[in-house]
């Protein structure tokens, strides 16, 4: 047997230390399973000058002093022992050979304790050795797990049981190792200070799933019912793995957002929430929330969760998308252009999701784009009709914002067709309506009189600017002859245009001039008729008083086409306008009535096809009197 084969080694060690003095050698501690036996190896020595004929010995329990009457475990002289050890103790060694090995059988827990040996050589040659052995009665195998078990690294777990009973030898097996991959088992017998230990070694590579796994070892004794089991839980260390995290998150501006990060690791990880390299929150925990109150578009972006411990780290990201209405659009580009130039205007905004962008002018859609943050408006060759106010509108499901901008188109003067002259008796009034940008200069030329009057001569010309329209009015008084030719000339830095102004109501002027002559002729004819009637009716005394008065000039016929966009009361405006024109054309002490049949235009920035409206705020005019 292995036990007997290795026992001489213990004796060799003891023999080498013999020095001819009182002394004993035995293991300081020894273990055995309950219900089995234990052999306590023992060797003693005494001085060489003592030559006893017979050597006796006594084993005591828990005390080395006889006067304390300790329980006698074994006594070679009388075989009288304490009742607890009756039938349980036996001396295996030969005291004559200084071998005091003791065998205890049918172990029970109360037998655990200290065992002392006393040598009896006869007479006064008795000696109780201070050396003793402590017996430990066990009932579970001892499973030894390394202090650090790391996932992915091979580990060795040992199961150790005492093997100090020569009559019963344990057999070891592992329990619960099926979930540990493909483990290998090795067995060996190990001697430790005179005691023997049966060892089973289990080799395996643990995983993170093995953390907390309950691993068992069983010691069974053949041909008996004795079985002893021991268990140990594996504490497997492994790096963090993030197992719980929000997917992409969408939130409306101003709402509350809670981001969760959960990780599995041993030991627990340090969890850190970060954004753009900045730490927002951290804690040693299995899960960590990041709460964002009333989120803004500035908090839109990618958030990272970092989990780390001494064995590694893991990280994941989540994208937070903050949904919000478009910001007020910004407009970059040309705001002033020359007629014929190409104009490029960029309207941009920011929103989530991207908006629908539209550019309007007078409720007409000029350009639009869907789900884009920028819109480019291209006008390849601008005209005066492109001048005006534009709107860039951005909208999505969360709101709408708009920005107005103006495009100013600069162009050469255009004298509108409603420009004309009107005459009544000795007064001529000329109206020149010019559309231009920038504001032009206006001059009236009378070729027959070799006279040129411009708008700076306020006593003759009145001018008023409204939007792109410039209205200049020239008043000529004392014109008794045929109406003069009047040429209106307008110029700015882009060009010059001239137009001979047509006359309206020229036939009325003619009748006004021949009116006195016609009255004289009519009077002569009337006298002749009266004389004839008098001669034929001599008996009739008829006194006729005939008077003829030329009367006032006939009323001037006004035929305006009054078109003012957005006017609340068209007819009231017409009456005010007529009164204003009468004041403008009024003679000294008279109210001349002229035929002014010209269109009225909206003084705002309207297309040229709209008519011109003369407002009642015009002042009194100076007169040019022609002798």
From Swiss-Prot:
Effect the entry attributes to changing residue 118 to A: Abolishes ganglioside binding
Record: residues binding a ganglioside GT1b (d18:1(4E)): 65-67, 118, 124-128
Post-translational modification: N-glycosylated.
Stretches of the chain forming a coiled coil according to its record: none
Ig-like C2-type domain sequence ranges: 139-237, 241-325, 327-412, 413-508
Residue ranges of the TM segments: 517-536
Chain spans, region Interaction with RTN4R and RTN4RL2: 20-325
Subunit (UniProt): Monomer and homodimer. Interacts (via the first three N-terminal Ig-like domains) with RTN4R and RTN4RL2. Interacts with isoform 2 of BSG.
Domains: entry comment: The C-terminal cytoplasmic region found only in isoform L-MAG is required for normal myelination in the central nervous system (CNS), but is apparently not required for normal myelination in the peripheral nervous system (PNS). The extracellular domain is required to protect against axon degeneration. The first three Ig-like domains mediate interaction with RTN4R and RTN4RL2, but are not sufficient to inhibit neurite outgrowth. The two C-terminal extracellular Ig-like C2-type domains are required for inhibition of axon longitudinal growth. Besides, the two C-terminal extracellular Ig-like C2-type domains are required for protection against apoptosis after nerve injury.
Protein's recorded name: Myelin-associated glycoprotein
Organism the protein comes from: Mus musculus
């Amino acid at each position: 047997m292995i036990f007997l084969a290795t026992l001489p080694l213990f004796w060799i060690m003891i023999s080498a230390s013999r020095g001819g003095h009182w002394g004993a050698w035995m293991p300081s501690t020894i273990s055995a399973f309950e219900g089995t036996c234990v052999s306590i190896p023992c060797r003693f020595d005494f001085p060489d000058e003592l030559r006893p004929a017979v050597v006796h010995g006594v084993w005591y329990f828990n005390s080395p002093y006889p006067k304390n009457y300790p329980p006698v475990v074994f006594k070679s002289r009388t075989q009288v022992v304490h009742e607890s050890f009756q039938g349980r103790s036996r001396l295996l060694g030969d005291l004559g050979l200084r071998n005091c090995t003791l065998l205890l059988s049918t172990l029970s827990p109360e037998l655990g304790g200290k065992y002392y040996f006393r040598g009896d050589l006869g007479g006064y040659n008795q000696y109780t050795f201070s050396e003793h052995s402590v017996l430990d009665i066990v009932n579970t195998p001892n499973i030894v797990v390394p202090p650090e078990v790391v996932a992915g690294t091979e580990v060795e777990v040992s199961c150790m049981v005492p093997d100090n009973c020569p009559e019963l030898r344990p057999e070891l097996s592992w329990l619960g190792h099926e979930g540990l991959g493909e483990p290998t088992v090795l067995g060996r017998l190990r001697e430790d200070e005179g005691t023997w230990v049966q060892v089973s070694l289990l080799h395996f590579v643990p995983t993170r799933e093995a953390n907390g796994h309950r691993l068992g070892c069983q010691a069974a004794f053949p041909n008996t019912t004795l079985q002893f089991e021991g268990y140990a839980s594996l504490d497997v260390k492994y790096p963090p793995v993030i197992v719980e995290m929000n997917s992409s998150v969408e939130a409306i501006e101003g709402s509350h957002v809670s981001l969760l990060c959960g990780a599995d690791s041993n030991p627990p990880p340090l969890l850190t929430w970060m954004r753009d390299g900045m730490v927002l929150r951290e804690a040693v925990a299995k899960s960590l929330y990041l709460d964002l109150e009333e989120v803004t578009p500035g908090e839109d972006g990618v958030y990272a969760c970092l989990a780390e411990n001494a064995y590694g780290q893991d990280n994941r990201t989540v994208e937070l998308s903050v949904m919000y209405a478009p910001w007020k659009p910004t407009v970059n580009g040309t705001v002033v252009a020359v007629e014929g130039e190409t104009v490029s205007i960029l309207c941009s905004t920011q929103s989530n999701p991207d908006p629908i962008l539209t550019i309007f002018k007078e409720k007409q859609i000029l350009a639009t784009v869907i789900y884009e943050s920028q819109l480019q408006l291209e006008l390849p060759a601008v005209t005066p009709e492109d001048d005006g106010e534009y709107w860039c509108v951005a909208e999505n499901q969360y709101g709408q914002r708009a920005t107005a901008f103006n495009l100013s188109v600069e162009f050469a003067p255009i004298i509108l067709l409603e420009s004309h002259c009107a005459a009544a008796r000795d007064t001529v009034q000329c109206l020149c309506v010019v559309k231009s940008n920038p504001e032009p200069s206006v001059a009236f030329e009378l070729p027959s009189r070799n006279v040129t009057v411009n708008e700076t001569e306020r006593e003759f010309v009145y001018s008023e600017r409204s939007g792109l329209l410039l209205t200049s009015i020239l008043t000529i008084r004392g014109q008794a002859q045929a109406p003069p030719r009047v040429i209106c000339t307008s110029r700015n830095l882009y060009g010059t245009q001239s137009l001979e102004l047509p006359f309206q109501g020229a036939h009325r002027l003619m009748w006004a001039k021949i009116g006195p002559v016609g009255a004289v002729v009519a009077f002569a004819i009337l006298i002749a008729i009266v004389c004839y009637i008098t001669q034929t009716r001599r008996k009739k005394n008829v006194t006729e008083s005939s008077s003829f008065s030329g009367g006032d000039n006939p009323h001037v016929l006004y035929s305006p086409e009054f078109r003012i966009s957005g006017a609340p009361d068209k007819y009231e405006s017409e009456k005010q306008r007529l009164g204003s024109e009468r004041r403008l054309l009024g003679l000294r002490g008279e109210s001349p009535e002229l035929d002014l049949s010209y269109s009225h235009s909206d003084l705002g920035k309207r297309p040229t096809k709209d008519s011109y409206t003369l407002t009642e705020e015009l002042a009194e005019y100076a007169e040019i009197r022609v002798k």
